[in-house]
Amino acid sequence: MLLRLELSALLLLLIAAPVRLQDECVGNSCYPNLGDLMVGRAAQLAASSTCGLYRPQNYCILGYLENERKCFTCDSRSPYNDYHNPSSHRIENIITTFQPERKMKWWQSENGVHEVSIQLDLEAMFQFSHLILTFKSFRPASMLVERSKDFGRTWKVFRYFAEDCANSFPGISEGPAHSIDDLVCDSRYSGAEPSTEGEVVLKALDPSFDIHDPYDSTIQGLITLTNLRVNFTRLLTLGDTLLTRRKRNPQDKYYYALYEMVVRGSCFCNGHASQCIPVDGARGDTFTEPGMVHGRCVCQHNTAGYNCERCQDFYHDAPWRPGGKADSDVCKRCNCHSHSEKCHFELARYLATGGVSGGVCDDCRNNRIGPQCELCGPFYYQDPQRSVDDPYACIPCDCDLDGSVDRGLCDPVNGQCVCKQNIEGERCDRCKVGFYGFSRDDPSGCQLCRCNFLGTIQVGNPCDPTTGRCICEHFAYGSQCDQCLPGYWGLGNTVYGCIPCDCDIGGALKTECSSVDGQCKCRPNMVGQKCNDPAPGYFLAPLDFYIYEAENAAPLAVISPFIGPPPFVYPTEGIPERPTKLPLCPPAPKPSSVPYREHITVQPSPAPHNPQVTLPMCEHYFRQRGYDFKISNGRLVVVKREKRQTRRRRQGQRTIPFEPGSPLQILLRQRANDQSITWTGLGFVRVQDGAGLRFTVSNIPATLDYYVVVRYEPESTDDWTAIVSILSIGSEDERCPNDQSNKMFTLPASGRTATLDLPVCLSDGNQYHVDITFRKQPSEDPHSSSFILIDSLGLIPKVESVPNFCSQSYLSQFQQYRCIELAVQAGGQTLPEVCEMLIGSMSAFIHNGAVSCNCHHVGAYGSSCSKFGGQCQCKPNVIGRCCDSCAPLTYGLGPNGCSPCDCDRSGSTTELCDQTTGQCSCRDGITGLQCNRCYPGYYGFPLCRRCQCNRLADICDPITGDCLDCREHSAGRNCERCEEGYVGDPVSGQPCEPCLCPDLNGSGRFFAFSCNKDPRSGAPYCECLPGHTGPQCDSCSPGFYGDLRLPGGRCKECCCNNNIDPRDGDACDPVTGECLRCLHNTEGPRCQSCKRGYYGNALAQDCKECSCDRRGTDDSKCPAGSPCFCDQDTGQCPCRPGVQGALCNECDDGYWNMDGDYGCQPCNCNREHALNYICDKITGQCLCQPEYGGRICDECGPNHFGNPDLQCMFCDCNLEGTVHPACDAYTGECLCKPGVTGPFCDECAPGHNNNFPACEPCHACNHLWEKIISDLSLDAERIETMMPCPEDFRSRPELQHLQNLLEKLQNVLNMGAQDELKKLEELLARIRNETEIIDPNIIIIDPTLLLNTDIDYIRLEFNKLLKNLREKAKEGPVTDIKAVNDIFNKIKKFYDEFTDSEKKVEAAKKVQEASRKTREKVTLELAKCQIGEMDKLERKVKALSAANINEEVCGAPGDAECEKAKCGGALCGKCGGPDCTGSLPISLNASKLAEMTEKNITALRSQLKEADAQLRNASEMTSYVKDQAENMMDKINRTKTKYEQEKTDTKALIEKVKTYLQDELVKPEDIEKLANAVLSIQLPKSPDEIKDMIEDIKKILANITEFNDDLEYLEKQAKIAGNMKERAKEILNRTELINVKEIEKALNDTAKLHDKIFNDLDEAEQNNDVIREKVNETEPKLKNIEDHLNLTRAKTLLDEIEALKNKTEMNRAQGKEAKDTADAALNSANDTGKDLEELKEQFEKLKLNSTNQNVSSEANERLKNITMEAENLAKHVEDKMKEIEDLEEKILLSNERKDEMRKELEALQKEADDLKKFIVDKVQRYNLCSP
């Protein structure tokens, strides 16, 4: 009954819990409480290994100090029970139960099993928090934790744990993690401490990371799981599993043992539940297990599922998501407006609504559709009077079936019908705007109005809705209003529809244009929309285009000729049949070859009755008369330069008669810069009263009426009358009848143009002569001029006569703006825009389009010209409208234009030249293209005097008059002397005769510059060439060679590279030139190489003696008794193999023992055990790995044992109780000190006290009892050992099997292997004997395992030997018999050595046996307690110890500890010291002293030999002191270098020996070997003999005074060449031996001088800054000067500017040099300051140490030198300062000069600008002439 009540209460609690939790989760996320997931899941927990699960198993523990018992039994066959089965260690024991005796139960794995796993399987998805493992045993050396989310199908690693992560889990990064999902290895939980109750903690999420979204997929992947597995991969052991000194299996104490495992987590509900209930189908005991975490969520927030992972039905309007702070938008109820009870979620709708609604209703009722059933279905629409929830709100559609589509389908919201394409209205019952013709049969309902919207009125409907007729805009027509009326275009471009055409009246053929783009129809070569622009390459002619110059007209009156220069006749050309087709730029007439003169008469065209002759074109006429044309704005400006000797009638003009006796003269008008041009052409024709001119007109463009215009200039105030007669040469044109009578009009004196009142009609196909006679009207002034100046005749078309040209309005504008008056005026006035437009249109009308430019293909830059006027763009010096002629004073039309004539004014009669050849007209006696030189035989232009050459030359230099090409072997300026190689006197008529030196000049054997006559004897003598000597120069001088007997032989300088004495006649072979007496230690046919045994640059006289170390040098290149032969260029000595260094004085890496018989020998370091192949270059010791030793690392190292080919293991001995080395290198047996025992030498031996490590001996009587107890104990242990154990019986079959294997191995390994096994057996026996005394409680290893280990080692050795044997077998048969013999000999030698060693071992065994007997005797004596005898025996034993030996060898008693023994000993790693008197330190000191003494003796002997050789050579080679001094300096330097190198090497050797002796790993036998080597060094006899030898050397050197003087002089010269910094350093060096007391005053003076130098340098720096600023100011000024340079300036000005520029550059360079000098002086002064500071410090030190010293004369001399050099330094600085000041003055003068030049350039620039402005103004006022 009570149980039933409890169940009922629990059920009520479970039912009420969701209601309470629902309130807690409203609007917020909620989570179940954390708990231990292990609780209640014992059945779901499993382990891969558990001890005693099938049978009881023993296990042992480590460090169990509470009880003597160390081994226990595990029996897990039944569950754990405190009373009945406390030894059960099943996996369920690790679940936390909170029992009082919690530590009494645990889970434990089997012994020695490394890989063990524990797995927890959960029934649902849980959220994991952290894991805690509490171990009873050591924590694992490595382990990992895995998780699964799919109930064990796949696994992922949580975290790795290892003591050594790199070896346990290679490739896994060691912590810490950088992100939440980093997979790392943690080493914090895998150490050996603590040995129990150690923990391993794993947190799912590292708290160091800031987690923003706990429901992120990455986070969920880390914290959710269905299974958890812990994998232990390696046990943590203490290294004793490989030892061979245990009787029990060490694996028994290594296993995994866990007190508890806590897996903290909770039910995973995605934030939508705070409570969980059991999962369906789970265990039935869930209600009885307190603290269990269940797996099924009690979901809130309208969610469902085990983990609340989905929404409830009909709650899909918002997507499911994990719980958060605001969960109002999670799993919302769908809104279907009461028309459905089912829905689903669509992400696309949710995104489209901006996250408002994502639910889509299913199966809508009441004609409803839509995601929320909010729309009416097809053919229904929403009744606006009803709500959406009303089941009757959708009513049927009402559409016109003729105008709607889809059978009357309407809009479901407003009921609007779906109309046809062109129908509108709610019921689709009318046409849209812009459409017409409503019809049922039309698919679109109505037709589109076909109106052009550009031409249609856009107000309302553009067409009638019934008929479709369009309503047009203005000027548009057509049924669709898509066309413009004729004369209009641009439909829709304006508000008026179309715009009128605007075609040019002359350029267009008609006024109509294209209605699309307004393009008019143009005349030929006219372009543009209006046809008002000429095409490229064409132009429009101006109104005054047809001008006929008076200079080209023919005279009407014939006057008798007068005497004058010959006339200039122009070639004639025929007149073409069609004048209208005459080119506007006809070919230029060929220029005459007759030179131009100042007065030129022109033969005019023949009489008027000869129509086939015409005057040349105006451009040619002007050009041939030396006038320059310039173009500006379509106008021609003629410029005439002033010439010397030019007769002028008036300023700016000259006259040229037409012909002899003619009353007409051509008046050339000179243009002034400031005068406007009021004429055309070259100038005027001066016509006498009554005379006339005939103008030929043959280029009429069209049959029109033309106004006749005469341009003139009166010479008086009288009016003139012009009588005009027009005569047609061809037949009369009916279209153009003319009155043949004369016409008259007045030329008023106040005007410049006159126009015939009535126009004349001229036809385009005819040629006319226009005759004009000029009459002066009567005048009251009898002195008035009877001449008038006629400029030109012009024909101006009459606008009114042009048929159908322009309207009355255009004519009114033409007259209003006085277009004709402006056009006929000369001077190039700018026309108004109206006039220019009308004239251009008329030109296009008259010429039927534009006129071709016809630009000359050579003279013009292109084919285009100016649009109005047609002026082409001419190249330099090219003129004419077509750019077809050279400008005056130029010639040679070509690709680059025309070249200037450049006629020399002094030699030419005019500045004009032939325009084809460029030949100028020269004066008498002058020739040349530019008339700038004299005729051959004359010189001195322009005076041109005859050459003076003594009749021995015909021509001379045209400038200097020096004769050229003198004959009869004469030479000189006037051929007044004989040429080289001849002798005579040409002035006096004595001929030049050849010299014989020794043969004639030109014979190939003439070796003199010339010859001469002796003034006394008159005999000729030769002046020899360099290198020749003798009366006839027939032999070579010293230092020269050559075979003068051969043709072409010469004496050439001997090429010996400055390595011979040029004064020595025998220095080189006189015939071959081979060098015979080479100096400076050189050799070779050219002394081009250093001698053998020397190296360096022979070309620079720098050959030094080789300094090779004979120990490391190849014997063949370094023979005994002679110097070594090194590389003659680099000095590299030829080293033996394994030796390196320029002097072969150092072993190469991988080699050692420089003092060996064959140089350095290889290190041969063991590749497997050495860190690298390099060893110590003195001892050969390789750098071994920590566990290896020996010279080549082929042995086990100190404190290690084993087989070095397999493995060396640490001895694990107590170093305080062992000797050195600590253990046996092969067996590992610890070698204990006396009084110490134990397998690890860690306890005191019997008979000694227990104060380890001191272990003082007990009383002597104690040995009696000790021996008795020991014997009894040994006997008991032997009896115990002989008793068989059950385990021994079990292992006998296995031992038998192993014995069989050993026999097989013995057969394979032959005798050697049997011996080794025998030794191993003996070793095992010894080990067993030694271990008898071990404490029986200590764990003993089973001997079976030991034997297995030994067999494994033997097997490895056998495999290794077998592998080597197979490799040798693969190499094939041996063919090198000698190598085989050598190997055999080596093997034999090694065998002999092995035999000797074996004998020594046998002898040692005998000694050992004798020692054993001795010990037995001692023991026997001790047993008798004979104290006196025991003391004697102790003294004898001590005498046999190493202490006395240490004292004798190292210098101090050897019984002290190594830390306290200052001199060390045999076991201390060192021997000897500073105050030690042993044999070894004495020998070391003797070695150092011997080495130093040997160096001194060697140096002194070398100096003695050199001094002796110098004495012998000094008397024989006095003339070569300089060369000998240089050689001596080289030898001294080499000797110094050699001694310094030997000193350095010796220091390095001593340092290496010191380092070697200080090394703790050095063996005593190696120290002894090194000491013997030092003692074997030969020392001098006595120090007194050394002193005597030194004194003798000093005496000998003191006698060499003359040589020392020369050497001192050379050294002084070399020192003078040094810089100031080196002098300052020398000052410091010279003060080392000076007494301070007497030079303090000089030092103070030097300090003051130092301060003064600093002040001067500061001023120099300031001046330098001023100079730098001046230079910076000069550079922009110089740039301005360069920018203002003008090419038109005279050459002298350019030269001055260039000189100024060079001067400025020089100043800049001097300024920079001064700056560099000042900087160098400043740096030097700074260095000097530093050096002086160092001097002061040195003086202060010397002051303390030199109180009793006397001042020597040498010190005084050095002091004087210091003072003198300091003064020189100050003077040098002052000189530099003065140079800087001078340079500053020069820069100032240069700046003033530049300012003057700048002002002059500015004035010239202004003058050039004014001139340019005037020229431009004049060019603009002149137009080109007509063709």
UniProtKB/Swiss-Prot annotation:
It holds the Pfam family Laminin_N. Disulfide bonds join 267-276, 269-297, 299-308, 311-331, 334-343, 336-361, 364-373, 376-394, 397-410, 399-417, 419-428, 431-446, 449-463, 451-470, 472-481, 484-498, 501-513, 503-520, 522-531, 853-865, 855-872, 874-883, 886-898, 901-913, 903-920, 922-931, 934-944, 947-956, 949-963, 966-975, 978-992, 995-1011, 997-1022, 1024-1033, 1036-1051, 1054-1068, 1056-1075, 1078-1087, 1090-1103, 1106-1126, 1108-1133, 1135-1144, 1147-1160, 1163-1175, 1165-1182, 1184-1193, 1196-1208, 1211-1223, 1213-1230, 1232-1241, 1244-1255. Residues 1-21 form the signal peptide. It is found in: Secreted, Extracellular space, Extracellular matrix, Basement membrane. PROSITE patterns: EGF_1 (PS00022), EGF_LAM_1 (PS01248), EGF_LAM_2 (PS50027), LAMININ_IVB (PS51116), LAMININ_NTER (PS51117). GO terms for cellular component: extracellular region; laminin complex. Residues 1477-1827 are annotated as: Domain I. Residues 1258-1449 are annotated as: Domain II. Keywords: Basement membrane, Cell adhesion, Coiled coil, Disulfide bond, Extracellular matrix, Glycoprotein, Laminin EGF-like domain, Repeat, Secreted, Signal. GO terms for biological process: animal organ morphogenesis; axon guidance; basement membrane assembly; cell migration; retina layer formation; substrate adhesion-dependent cell spreading; tissue development. Residues 267-333, 334-396, 397-448, 449-500, 501-544, 853-900, 901-946, 947-994, 995-1053, 1054-1105, 1106-1162, 1163-1210, 1211-1257 form the Laminin EGF-like domain. Glycans are attached at residues 231, 1001, 1329, 1485, 1496, 1513, 1533, 1599, 1629, 1644, 1672, 1686, 1702, 1726, 1745, 1750, 1761. SUPFAM superfamilies: EGF/Laminin. Residues 540-847 form the Laminin IV type B domain. Disruption phenotype: Significant defects in apical-basal distribution of Muller glia cell bodies in the retina. Residues 26-266 form the Laminin N-terminal domain. CDD domains: cc_LAMB4_C, EGF_Lam, SPEC. Residues 1294-1335, 1385-1449, 1485-1554, 1584-1820 form a coiled coil. The alpha-helical domains I and II are thought to interact with other laminin chains to form a coiled coil structure. Binding to cells via a high affinity receptor, laminin is thought to mediate the attachment, migration and organization of cells into tissues during embryonic development by interacting with other extracellular matrix components. Positively regulates apical-basal distribution of Muller glia cells in the retina. Laminin is a complex glycoprotein, consisting of three different polypeptide chains (alpha, beta, gamma), which are bound to each other by disulfide bonds into a cross-shaped molecule comprising one long and three short arms with globules at each end. This is Laminin subunit beta-4. It comes from Danio rerio (Zebrafish). The gene is lamb4.
